[in-house]
Each structure stands twice: as structure tokens, then as C-alpha cells.
Amino acid sequence: MKAPGLPADQQFFADLFSGLVLNPQLLGRVWFASQPASLPVGSLCIDFPRLDIVLRGEYGNLLEAKQQRLVEGEMLFIPARAANLPVNNKPVMLLSLVFAPTWLGLSFYDSRTTSLLHPARQIQLPSLQRGEGEAMLTALTHLSRSPLEQNIIQPLVLSLLHLCRSVVNMPPGNSQPRGDFLYHSICNWVQDNYAQPLTRESVAQFFNITPNHLSKLFAQHGTMRFIEYVRWVRMAKARMILQKYHLSIHEVAQRCGFPDSDYFCRVFRRQFGLTPGEYSARFQG
């Protein structure tokens, strides 16, 4: 039964979730991505848990030998700050979920019409990952250390899909005010795409608003201007990379959205009082 009054994209995902939860026998093994010592070029790594579900065809994770051929019904759970490198040369329909603290991100990929870099459909819905949802995600993250416990893992993922279905079936009028949700959506999107060449104009265009509207959102709902927020996110990512990974300063700058490593070093030193090299030395010792 279709939920009443849902926008077209939201109804599309509502139908997808209905097909999944009403046919659990079609769901297969749940695989788990891990956190690599270094991040290969092209790999995906964000601060939120993710779940990729193969709806049709073949998918895979090139970072794990046993995960390079995932077939219809199989799933890949990527804990927060874990990474995957998608196989993108096979015919596939894929549903990808992102579990952020205040929103649920849904993307549908169809290799017949788009690549795995560009979703055919994509929405973000307000959803506080607290209580039941947070407990499920925490449990799955812990179970990633015991991936063979499929008799526990699969029912847990099915319960998570039921919860997602309830979020997707919620009419937009029952959600938080649009301005607040849009502001948090932009902030979270920047956290996922900080390595890209972001400008006020390009981000505003992506969210189908004017640059002035974007600036107004940050003035009303945030504590810093948009460009300052982008710089803050990039600096936070740079600190994390410098603490955990043995990369050149040029590589760190590139991964954090700074094509000019000299400018990256100046910004980093101005913000933290140390050069990136000095900061890294404190942790890499």
C-alpha cells in the first residue's frame, strides 16, 4: 500500500523498501567493510555508517578480496570511517543508505543510465538516529568483527530496513522546518564532499537554491559563514588524516580539497599554530 501524499522520489524509495522488507527471503549475506591503513584513490570514506544493497546485477568492494563479487540480495555494511572502493564495471542496480545523526540519505544507482558516481535518484530525509536506530547501527558496527554471525546479523539488518521504511513513509509535513533541515542537509553534504572544489555557487546550485539563500541559511541557523564552515570541515579532516595515515603533505592537501599545498599549510598553521608536518610528527612519532 502506497503512503499518501509522498513526493515522487520519496515514493520511489518507499516502494523499494516495501519490496525489500516484504520479501526478506530475497536478502542475502551481509558483508562488512573495514578501515584500511591508507585510503586508496577512488575509495569512499565518511564519518557515518552506510549500507549498500544489491538490487540487481553485480557489485563489489575492491578493498576486500572476498567482497569483489556481491550478487543480487547481498549487502555491504560500511561502519563510520571504514572505506570501500566500488566495482563500477558491472551491470548493477544499487540502493545506498547513509545514516547521519539527523538525516537518512538514500541513493539509487542504475548502471544502465548512470555511473556509480552519479545516482539516478537521491533524497535526504530528516531522521534522528537515536534510540532503536542508533542501537542497531552500534550493534552492526560491533558485529563487523564477527562477520560469520549471519543468523544474528541478517535479522538485525532487516529490522533496520523496517525502521528506514517507516522514515521514508512519513509525509513531509511531519518533518522538521524546511530551513533547519536544509541547513543541516547542506552541512552534512559538505562533510561528505569536502574533497571536491566547493564554492557557494556550486553548492547552492546542487541544492536548487540561490547563493544568497545559502548564505542566509548559514547566518540564521549556524555559527559561521558557509566558506568558513567548508574550511572548518576540511581542517578537521586534515587533522584526522595526519593523525592516522602516513601521507605526504601534498596528498593530505589534495584529499582535503586544497589543490595548492602551500595554501593548505598556511591555513593549517593559522588555525592550529603548527605546520601539518609538525602536527603529524606529534602523532606518528
Curated annotation (Swiss-Prot):
GO terms for molecular function: DNA-binding transcription factor activity; sequence-specific DNA binding. The keyword Nucleotide-binding does not apply. The keyword Transcription regulation applies. Keywords: DNA-binding, Transcription, Transcription regulation. Residues 201-222, 249-272 bind DNA. It comes from Escherichia coli (strain K12). Residues 184-282 form the HTH araC/xylS-type domain. It comes from the Bacteria. InterPro entries: Homeodomain-like_sf, HTH_AraC, HTH_AraC-typ_CS, Tscrpt_reg_AraC-type_HTH. Pfam families: HTH_18. This is Uncharacterized HTH-type transcriptional regulator YpdC.
